[in-house]
Amino acid sequence: MKRTIVIPALLLLAASAVAQTTSAQTTPAQTKNPVSTALRDILPGRQKNTVAAVEAMPADKFNYKPSADQMTFGRLVTHMVETNDLLCSKAAAVPAAKVEEIKDTDSKDNLVAALKASFDFCSDALAKMDDSKLEETTEGFGGKQVTRAWISMVLAGAWSDHYAEAAMYLRLNGVLPPTAKK
């Protein structure tokens, strides 16, 4: 009888030890700046996919809009540039990028260059960011005071949202989005 209790108990103990060892091996290393580190880690993939999506859209489709109420693809790209410049500067507490004004009707080459420059600005800004300023407030949308942590979360969400929008525009024009090609 004791044997029937001891053997399962030992097996359970061994399984628990293996699970803890496996868990410890897959847990990411602790960092003093988890939010800013996460943004820096996420940025290269979002940049690669978003720039590739914009580059994939034929130049003659930059004036395409899915419906009368939606923005053109060119406007979507200028929105991405404006968002990157604004949110990366606010999240990292650095001055906004000094860039030439772009228009929705600019050439594809100009819009792609502006988008790349905005992601480069984000990379530089986020390299200076640390989590010690996340509790600081800054002006958000509509003049509302928000924390840099709030801005950081909106920034990460915006990158995903913008790629998803670009992918939808591509599909509506018969173009396969970059992440669908894998």
Feature roles, as predicted:
Residues 5-13:
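Sec-dependent N-terminal signal peptides
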Residues 60-61, 132:
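Secondary-structure boundary/capping positions in well-ordered alpha/beta enzyme cores
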Residues 20-38, 82-144, 173-182:
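Short, helix-capping/interhelical loops that line the mouth of catalytic, cofactor-
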Residues 14-19:
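N-terminal signal peptide c-region/cleavage motif recognized by signal peptidases
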